[in-house]
């Protein structure tokens, strides 16, 4: 059995915000509030990075229209004693998905560690 570091991305909708910084703060706070009661404080939450198609500069994954933001969050957790990287990603999606119901999740990276 092997240990894995699994990275997921989540699409988080935030209403009634005017700036990208406000949207990021609210999204991270709301995600934390939903993870902590389930004792998932080991899940790292951060804003994702998107690259500009024109200049390739990185910027925070936030899009705002009509005071509603779509924030791309990155969720990271370690999975111990998984049979494969596929098994580790299923475990991570299941654990995080139970706390973040109705939030789209996608696996972006699975890395083995000792």
Swiss-Prot record:
Pfam family, one: DUF555
NCBIfam families: PRK03922.1
Domain of life: Archaea
Organism: Methanococcoides burtonii (strain DSM 6242 / NBRC 107633 / OCM 468 / ACE-M)
Lineage: Archaea, Methanobacteriati, Methanobacteriota, Stenosarchaea group, Methanomicrobia
Family to which the UniProt record says this protein belongs: Belongs to the UPF0212 family.
InterPro entries attached to this UniProt entry: UPF0212
Protein name per the record: UPF0212 protein Mbur_0968
């Amino acid at each position: 059995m092997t240990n894995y570091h699994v990275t997921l991305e989540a699409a988080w909708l935030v209403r009634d915000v005017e700036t990208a910084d406000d949207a990021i703060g609210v999204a991270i706070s709301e995600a934390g509030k939903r993870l902590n009661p389930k004792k998932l404080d080991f899940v790292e939450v951060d804003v994702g990075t998107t690259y500009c198609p024109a200049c390739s500069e990185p910027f925070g994954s936030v899009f705002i229209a009509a005071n509603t933001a779509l924030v791309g969050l990155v969720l990271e957790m370690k999975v111990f004693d998984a049979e494969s990287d596929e098994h580790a990603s299923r475990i991570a999606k299941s654990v995080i998905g139970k706390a973040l119901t109705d939030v789209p999740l996608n696996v972006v990276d699975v890395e083995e560690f000792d």
